[in-house]
Amino acid sequence: MEGKGPSFKVIIVGASVTGLTLAHCLHRAGIDYVVLEKHHEVHPPIGAAVAILPNGGRIMEQLGIFRHIEDRCQPFQRVHLCFQDGFYYDSLSPSVVLKRFGLKFAALERTQLLEILYTHLPDKSRVLTSKGVVRITPHGNKMSVTTADGDEFQGDLVVGADGVHSVTRREMWRIANIEQPGLIPFKEQASMSVEFSCIFGMSNPIPGRKHWQHIIRIGPGFTFLIFPAAGDSLFWVLIEKLPHKYIYPDVPRFSQEDAVTRCEAAASQPVWQEVRFRDIWAQRRGFRMVALEENLFRTWHHGRIICIGDSISKMTPNIGQGANTAIEAAAGLANVIYAITQNHHQPSDDTIHRALANFSERHRKRLDAIHLESRWITRLEACQGWVVTAFTRYVAPHCGDLFALGVVRNSYNGEVLQFLPLTERSGKHWPKLEWWNTWGLSKWQEFGERLVYCFGVVILLWISWAVFNVNQL
């Protein structure tokens, strides 16, 4: 480990993508840490895919890990956005990203990413498995974390990287409401909701089909996401709108039988050209059905506890930013810890509070915009409402490469590790963000033509809406 700051120990709860990324960052910063993981292994074979986009990839590049991620991924150059009536259009966002940032669109199994992060962690003895946290207790300027097997760990800061069902978040709320009754109101504790289900899986190659691209199949109340995997295998996701909204923790739980029923019901749905979902389903290797929680909590920290990643920020997989914003949060928090431990004195409670408050406020502002985009895209791709459906089908295809715009825009203004040098691919010479380029527009004339077209479509939609309302009178 590097660094010469005072003795300061971080207890990371959860060997997740967030937790292991933070472990790498702290190692490079010379900060003492331990990772407590409740499962018996660090990278269980859970099967879900994860996308690494430039805002997460640049941090992995700084840590020297991105090249190992690239080695596990199947390259692709475009995204097919397909509709029920047979119409489709392409986004060149993977090619745009590679040209602009030097980073490939990376899609791999979450367990593969965890394996990479763990394998390349210099000191694996700091990652302890079968250590489910049951209690967190403040002791003056120290924190005590108790695990289910009775072990107790002492540290200066506890970081919750333990996912959507976070014990750390629950303990933070408990302690906060003991020390300041009402600090975490019930409204915030009940602010996470579920409106969509998700079946994610992986399939072996489909006979006669090679060289897959990323596919987004848009339909009424559902969305298919297809990602190419190594060896012409496929990652796939089926997202469906649920009959009504659920408030966490009273959310549905799904069995494998539920997943089979839904997938068989979707078997006849077209995916790409002559391939239907039944062809992908027939080659299935593994699958699982879950509820998709959505929320950005407002309170991220209290005292010497802070939550990051899915424990505090949960979105659907539609824009692929869940893991990437979690990686950003790990890097941003590492920057904060590094900064407050460089004056050779133990940071006070007040110093820690101000540092965590500034970090939370800054990162939450960025996440507010990304969450808004995620919620909008999720409902847009599920054709939720006739206005959204009309925009998706008839307006968006003529507005330039909106998909590339979103990816490129979210790649800027994110966190980087301030105590490590930037490389070419982590942003040292990234081109300046110019909005007309991100739209894929080569000429102002083309922009004018598209603007006029879109304005005309909007007027037609408004007239249709007005006529519809008159007819209802």
Curated annotation (Swiss-Prot):
It is found in: Membrane. GO terms for molecular function: FAD binding; monooxygenase activity. Glycans are attached at residue 358. One of its GO terms (cellular component) is membrane. The keyword RNA-binding does not apply. InterPro entries: FAD-bd, FAD/NAD-bd_sf, FAD_mOase_fung. It is a multi-pass membrane protein. FAD binds at residues 37, 51, 110, 310, 323. The keyword Glycoprotein applies. Pathway: Mycotoxin biosynthesis. Keywords: FAD, Flavoprotein, Glycoprotein, Membrane, Oxidoreductase, Transmembrane, Transmembrane helix. Its main location: membrane. Its EC number is 1.-.-.-. Its cofactor is FAD. It holds the Pfam family FAD_binding_3. Citreoviridin inhibits mitochondrial oxidative phosphorylation by binding to the beta-subunit of F1-ATPase. Ectopic mitochondrial ATP synthase is a factor that mediates HIV-1 transfer between antigen-presenting cells (APCs) and CD4+ target cells, and citreoviridin can completely block antigen-presenting cell (APC)-mediated transfer of HIV-1 at the APC-target cells. Inhibition of ectopic mitochondrial ATP synthase by citreoviridin can also lead to suppression of cancer growth by activating the unfolded protein response. The chain crosses the membrane at residues 218-238, 451-471. FAD-dependent monooxygenase; part of the gene cluster that mediates the biosynthesis of citreoviridin, an inhibitor of the of F1-ATPase beta-subunit. The HR-PKS ctvA accepts acetyl-CoA as the starter unit and catalyzes eight iterations of malonyl-CoA extension and four iterations of SAM-dependent methylation at C4, C12, C14, and C16. The KR and DH domains selectively act on the first six iterations to generate the hexaene chain. Belongs to the paxM FAD-dependent monooxygenase family. PANTHER family: FAD-BINDING DOMAIN-CONTAINING PROTEIN-RELATED, FAD-DEPENDENT MONOOXYGENASE ASQG-RELATED. This is FAD-dependent monooxygenase ctvC. It comes from Aspergillus terreus (strain NIH 2624 / FGSC A1156). The lineage of its organism: Eukaryota, Fungi, Dikarya, Ascomycota, Pezizomycotina.
